[in-house]
């Protein structure tokens, strides 16, 4: 069994801070659950370009308001109680309005813990996941 508190994770290397957001990565690849679980805060009045080419993500808004705009598609409001699922590697813009948004996020494959979006909004794929994908394609 694994038991962790948000506060102890926040005070450790599991907290990753970027320009527009911070993420407390409570469950990671090395926990061997097959997914990772994060509490992510999107800072107020920000817009972040994201394109998870290598990961699927489900996001539940716990507090705050904003919107998600799918590139070339629709814009959806986000408020407490909203769940959105990026099941098509959707390129998108995530915007927080006048208050920060606090989100519970689940990633598959799981993150290792130190990922930050690259210039195209992508998290890199872990080397072992890349090898696994290559074997599946054969």
Swiss-Prot record:
Pathway membership: Amine and polyamine biosynthesis; ectoine biosynthesis; L-ectoine from L-aspartate 4-semialdehyde: step 3/3
GO molecular function, one term: ectoine synthase activity
Keywords: Lyase
One family name in Pfam for this protein: Ectoine_synth
Presence of the UniProt keyword Lyase in the record: yes
CDD domains listed in its UniProt record: cupin_EctC
UniProt cross-references to InterPro entries, sorted A to Z: Ectoine_synth (IPR010462), RmlC-like_jellyroll (IPR014710), RmlC_Cupin_sf (IPR011051)
Enzyme class, first EC level, given as a word: lyase
Catalytic reactions on record: (2S)-4-acetamido-2-aminobutanoate = L-ectoine + H2O
EC number(s) on file: 4.2.1.108
One GO term of the biological process aspect: ectoine biosynthetic process
Superkingdom assignment: Bacteria
Annotated NCBIfam families: PRK13290.1
Role summary: Catalyzes the circularization of gamma-N-acetyl-alpha,gamma-diaminobutyric acid (ADABA) to ectoine (1,4,5,6-tetrahydro-2-methyl-4-pyrimidine carboxylic acid), which is an excellent osmoprotectant.
Family per similarity comment: Belongs to the ectoine synthase family.
Listed name of the protein: L-ectoine synthase
Gene (UniProt): ectC
């Amino acid at each position: 069994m694994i038991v962790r508190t948000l506060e102890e994770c926040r005070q450790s290397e599991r907290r990753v801070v970027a320009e527009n957001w911070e993420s407390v990565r409570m469950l990671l690849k090395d926990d061997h659950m097959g997914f990772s679980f994060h509490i992510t805060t999107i800072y107020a009045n920000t817009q972040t370009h994201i394109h998870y080419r290598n990961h699927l993500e489900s996001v539940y808004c716990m507090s705050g308001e904003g919107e998600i705009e799918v590139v070339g598609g629709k814009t959806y409001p986000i408020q407490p109680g909203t769940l959105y699922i990026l099941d098509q590697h959707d390129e998108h813009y995530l915007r927080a309005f006048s208050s920060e948004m606090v989100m519970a996020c689940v990633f598959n494959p799981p993150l290792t813990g130190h990922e930050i979006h690259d210039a195209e909004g992508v998290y890199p794929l872990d080397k072992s996941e890349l090898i696994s994908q290559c074997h599946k394609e054969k």
